[in-house]
Amino acid sequence: MTDKTSLSYKDAGVDIDAGNALVGRIKGVVKKTRRPEVMGGLGGFGALYALPQKYREPVLVSGTDGVGTKLRLAMDLKRHDTIGIDLVAMCVNDLVVQGAEPLFFLDYYATGKLDVDTASAVISGIAEGCLQSGCSLVGGETAEMPGMYHGEDYDVAGFCVGVVEKSEIIDGSKVSDGDVLIALGSSGPHSNGYSLVRKILEVSGCDPQTTELDGKPLADHLLAPTRIYVKSVLELIEKVDVHAIAHLTGGGFWENIPRVLPDNTQAVIDESSWQWPEVFNWLQTAGNVERHEMYRTFNCGVGMIIALPAPEVDKALALLNANGENAWKIGIIKASDSEQRVVIE
């Protein structure tokens, strides 16, 4: 190098032109998510959002999440179009279990070398997730960081803010002996347990793209986007007395259900009330995974569990199934001082 050599940001591995091209590519899909409360357009230093006027005592609810090592599987299989839906789902589903309506979403996309096609596919998926949940994609950060990530590997994180009427917050405090538990079916493993999924693929020597399961490649089952329950659950909350909702994520049945149970109550799950989707049977068999570990790592076909009074069950099931959910009675709440908060029998 001579003294006359002029270095640029691009020489250092950061392509501003590629970043600008990405913004141009995604503007259209982002615009489709816009709610009337959004003030200003994409590209400002901060996103402005006016609270909906229908709330008398609005309480903001926030959440952040990622998609774990499902992202590694998506990168290995070069399938980036649905991982954004997963990202939104993990955040908005956590909000709605508290009764909150998701309002707006932001994303963080970090990579070693920005590939516009890949990033566009991911962010288009994020926009689709926002459409499914009725929230606005108001901004995000795309960080190209050479030396921090290998090649075109990337990571994503999501941030969501919602709102709930103070008097209508769902916190599990109303759960009581005799309440009935309703399950909402999942679309697959959702976004949890993928380090175990990848280990099972490794030890079994299985190629998920050529292995058939239920008439389609195993990869389709494993990369099926996380189901977004927001619109169905918000309508349910509006019409039925819901006592608690648990989103079955990391920790499965054993750890997520107790998060919404008051002291001296126990959830009793009827294992005969549903059949595991085939992908979970395959994972258990291929990995020789014990039953307790399956229920601790995976949702086993159950994305959410809702507690409500017994007289409301028929109405709730009819409403949920009419909205396209696979809903069924999965158990009951019992009074108990046992340390075992969840029983599966």
Curated annotation (Swiss-Prot):
Gene: purM
Main subcellular location of this protein, as a coarse class: cytoplasm
Compartments it resides in: Cytoplasm
GO BP annotations listed: 'de novo' IMP biosynthetic process; adenine biosynthetic process
Keyword Cytoplasm annotated: yes
CDD domains per the UniProt record, alphabetical: PurM
Family, similarity comment: Belongs to the AIR synthase family.
Pathway(s) of this molecule: Purine metabolism; IMP biosynthesis via de novo pathway; 5-amino-1-(5-phospho-D-ribosyl)imidazole from N(2)-formyl-N(1)-(5-phospho-D-ribosyl)glycinamide: step 2/2
Domain of life: Bacteria
Official protein name in the record: Phosphoribosylformylglycinamidine cyclo-ligase
GO cellular component: cytosol
Catalysed reactions listed for this entry: 2-formamido-N(1)-(5-O-phospho-beta-D-ribosyl)acetamidine + ATP = 5-amino-1-(5-phospho-beta-D-ribosyl)imidazole + ADP + phosphate + H(+)
GO molecular function: ATP binding; phosphoribosylamine-glycine ligase activity; phosphoribosylformylglycinamidine cyclo-ligase activity
Alphabetized UniProt keyword annotations: ATP-binding, Cytoplasm, Ligase, Nucleotide-binding, Purine biosynthesis
